[in-house]
Amino acid sequence: MNYLDIIQDREIVAILGQIDILKQADCKYFGILHTLSTIEFAKQLSKCFDLTDEEENLLLIACALHNIGHLNGKNLHAQTGAEMAKVYLTKHGMDIKDVNIIGNAISSHLGRRNDNFYDSVSACLILADKMDFGSTRIKPNFEEMSFEDEVLRHITKVNVSRTGDVVELMLGGIDVDWKVFVQSSAYAKLYRCFETVCKKYNYSFVVRVKKVN
């Protein structure tokens, strides 16, 4: 099973469609477009995090299912979605070990605890999810989404060339202890991604994260 099987499954398409209808008044998109955009960011992050093909497949499946819990309301949607995903994946014959990895990623995708980032699949889902909500997207063609473009947009927006600032701005929705987070392997890998983009476009590269004083 892969993410394409899931996003083409009538059951999942129906759930995401219902979520889009339920969330119309929120001016946010938790359904189909957000799911597809999150998948696109995750594909790029999987390369930054050096995920194996197997890990990338699990990540993209987690992306495809990460918000299905919104069908039962926003509160606790991460936990509800994780349980729904486990039932769905088990029903379709997925190995229990892989089911648990995906379930853990979905349950922790809000990124509210530093230990949510210890697992690479979970970390990539959190980052991809937050990058989509931090992007310029207002119902665009999801294929136009670009991790590189978002890094550059944030650099231009705040008129800074300090990668640490851009990391914080792009991931502002992550409610973690930044003093701890900047010491984590997830931050180190993300930092490397930003460094690559900055150097490609000749931005000076100086680390400064405002929340860490």
Summary of predicted features, one role per range:
Residues M1-L76:
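Acidic/His-rich, divalent-metal-binding segments that scaffold phosphate/diphosphate chemistry
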Residues L4-D5, V13-D20, G103, S107, ...:
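Generic detector of well-ordered alpha-helical segments enriched in charged/polar residues
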Residues C48-S161:
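Divalent metal-dependent catalytic cores for phosphoryl transfer on phosphate-bearing substrates
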Residues F41-Q44, A105, K130, C193:
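Alpha-helical scaffold segments in carbohydrate-active enzymes
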Residues S135-N213:
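Terminal helices and disordered tails flanking the catalytic cores of nucleotide-processing hydrolases
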